[in-house]
Each structure stands twice: as structure tokens, then as C-alpha cells.
Amino acid sequence: MKKMRWTAMAMAAAMVLSSGAAIPAMAEEAVGGNEEVLTSEPHKIRTIITTDGEIDDQCSLVRYMLYANMFELEGLVSSSSKFHYTTKEGEVFKGKTENQKWIDAYAQVYENLCKHADGFPDPEYLTSINVEGNVTAPGEMGTDTPGSLLIKKCIMDEREDMLFLQVWGGANTIAAALRSIEEEYKGTDQWEEVYKKVCDKIVLWNDLDQDNTVNDYILPHWPDVKVIMSYDQFWAIGYPWSSTTPEVYHKYYDEEFMTKYIANDANSLSQIYYNNLTSMGGEGEHPIRFLSEGDTPNFFYILDNGLRSWENPSYGGWAGRFNKVNCADDAWNIGSEERDPMATSGQMLSGYWNEASDDGDRYKPIWRWADDFQNEFAARMKWCTEEYENANHEPVVQVEEGIDLTAKRGETVTLTAKTYDPDGDQVSVAFWQYGDADTYGGDVELTAGEGDQVSFTVPEDAKTGDTIHIIVEAQDDDEETPITRYQRVIVTVGAETEQ
């Protein structure tokens, strides 16, 4: 069931609902109702984007630029795929040059973006990390290139935090970096330490498996590297979105929405985005409808919007949700098609892979958030041209009791949300159980309390170690493009105390 948002002040405090429906809080005060001003700095994850320049990559790159303040980008690397490469007959593969067009468009709105949020990277810095990778053929990984060497340098530096490698095309430039590391260190007394360093540090998101390097090289040679295999779910925001997303959400992708909020001749990023929307139709006029952003889930996964999706692929968020493959500790997938065998940790993977579905729908883990991420896309697009006071900005939400809690069977858990909106908007709060992300297999009853508060009792049939995920949503009341922020509270069932 889709989460529901109801008018908070109309609800009775004693209302009880089960999993699947949202409990709205009884907020009675504007601007979140807090005397103190809450603040929230984004948790920025290090990342490198590799792209083959497909038109939907280009659309994703525009959206990425609007969120560039939320990440620590270390490289923008051109890479080939089985669809695009320099030696393909009839192909004009522009690579680094094409990426620079997007950086130049970003540069034109950079100063205005900085009026709305701190942390947007300088365009000159982006130009300095825009490099060519392995682009000559699908799966070519035998050559050291500026892109592969940049990736290798980031992997081998002294930092220990996660390095998230985004594969928008083929994984071959990343494979070339790993091949170079293996050639340099394997057979030396440093190899065991280097191998562990690499496997502990990097997480690789592989979109559509667009060359053979993950199957043929990365997993057999680096079986402990964490890999997220994304095959199907991203179609909820990809080319076939109209058939994978329920009709109720089509209004966030259709011509009216895109024309009103995205197409803006005064906005250089907007221009380059909607030019792609119309270019696919050939000659003549074409509707400005959403086209495809199949690679956007790459960075949605590490976007700090409060859903904590990067902590564990099974949690779910704007990027979708993933099941663990039993025979490979660190391979996560959402695909349902039969794949070639992959060697990992000495075992082979083949056949139908488990797909993470919400309510039995394999696309729902993304489309359930469509209104939220499309509204924020529209709001951030406005940041490119408007002054701060004429645009909408995200609210802040925190949970007073914390976001990682332990409770015993039969114990009552109370959650109190505190909110703030930088624009002075009213903020509505809703609570709901994300049952698909739980390891506890049942529903909990949520009871609305006073103010922005909800409570529930841990069921008696819950097992020690089971987790219950409660999503706390805070949405401002902007009339056109409301923005939503979240907190995910994970309640772990604790062991009973022996008498």
C-alpha cells in the first residue's frame, strides 16, 4: 500500500493504524513547532561517476548537478559500454568533451545555486576531475588511462571511508584500475593487506551489466568487493517509466509538469535537459515528457535524505531496495533475468536472482517515492535562477529518542519528531512502518500521540534480533513543489532478561 499523508490537525490522538498506512502527527504549530532551530549537514559520501554518455546518462547528470552539494565527487570518468564506444561504426563518442558541456552549463548557474545551499563544487574543480577512461571497445580494461589511474589513486589513498563507484555504462574503467592494482601488488608481501583495503573500501553499483568486466574479471579476482547489481528496478525511472510506474504518478513525469517546472530557457541546466527530451523524436515538435534517468538511482543510493539507504542495500530508499544473494556475501541484486555464472568467494552464481519487491511489485521500491523525488527535482531546478526567498528548501527532521533503538517484546516504543523549515513553511509529519525492509515479518500498530509523536508495542512474536523500520516523513507545505525529508528509525528486538 502506498504511504498516505493526511492533514495532521484533523486526526484524533488515539487513532490506531497498522503497517502500510501513515500515522500523521498532530502538529499544531508553524515552522515545525520548535523554539530552537534544528540544523542538518549532509553526510557526504566519496564517489566517482563513470558514464558512457548515453542520453539518459546525460539527463541523470543534470539532476546530479542540482544535488552536487550532497556528495564528495572525486571523478567524472568517460567509459565505454556495449552500446557506446569510440570504434563503433557510425558512433560519434564524445566522452570527456560531452561531459564538459554539462559542467559548462552548471557553471552558468553555479553562483545562484550557492545562494540556496553550501557545498556546491566549483566548476573549475569539476573540470579538473573530468577525465577520459577506457572507451575504445566494450570491456576493454587492459590499458591504463587517465580515468583508470584516477580511480586507482582514490582507491589506494590513505582514506578509509567508503568510495562509492557508480557504473552508468560499462565497468571496464573500474576494472582497469583494479587490474593495475592486482598487477602491482599480487605476489608481493603487501598483497593480502592491499586486497583487504580495496574490498573494505569500495562499493560498486553496476547498472544493467553493460559489459563483461564484472562477471569476467572483478568478481573472480576480487570476490570480496561489495557489488550492487541493478538490472530491473531502475526502469521505474528509466525509458519504460510509463509502464512500470502506476498512472497516479504519471502527473510527475508528463508534459504539464515537465514544461512548468523543468523547461526554462533562462536556466542552462534546464535547457540541456529538455533538449534531450525533444531530441529523441526526430523532426518536428514533440511533447516535453520525462524521457529516462536510468542512472539516477546510482547517486540516489548515497543521497543523505534521511532514509539511510547506503547503510544496507536491504533498507530501501529512492534508489530502490535489494535482496541478499545467499551464495555471495557481498553481491546484492534486484534483477530477475537469468545471468551468466559469476565466481565469487569460490562459488558460482547463476539462474534467477532474487529481486527485492515491495508488496510484490519489483518496481515499487523506486516508484513509491516518485512524488517526493520529482517535486524536489523541480524545486532544485528553480534554485538555478531564483533568489533564496523565491524558492523552496528542504525541511529538517530529527527524532528525539534516536534512530537506532533496542526494545524487548511487549515494550512500548515512543517516537517524537522535531522539525524545522528554513522558509517558515508549516511542516506535516507522518509515521509509517516499512514492512518490506523489516526482518520482523509482521505488522505493528502505530498509535498517534500528542504533537509529532507516535508509539507502538513490540509484538510478542518478534524474535531477538528482529528489526522494525519506522519511516518518519516531514514535508513542507509549499503549494507547488513540497520537499520531503525523512528519518528511518530501526528498532531491534532485544533479548529477554533472565530472572
Model feature map: region roles:
Residues 1-10:
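Bacterial N-terminal signal peptides that target proteins for export
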Residues 490-496:
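Short beta-strand edge segments in extracellular beta-sheet folds
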Residues 28-445, 453, 457, 461, ...:
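N-terminal acidic, glycine/proline-rich low-complexity segments
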Residues 482-489:
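Extracellular and select intracellular beta-sandwich modules with Ser/Thr-enriched
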Residues 475-482:
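Short, solvent-exposed loop/turn segments at the edges of extracellular beta-sandwich modules
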Residues 19-30:
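Sec-dependent signal peptide cleavage junction
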Residues 11, 15-19:
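Hydrophobic core
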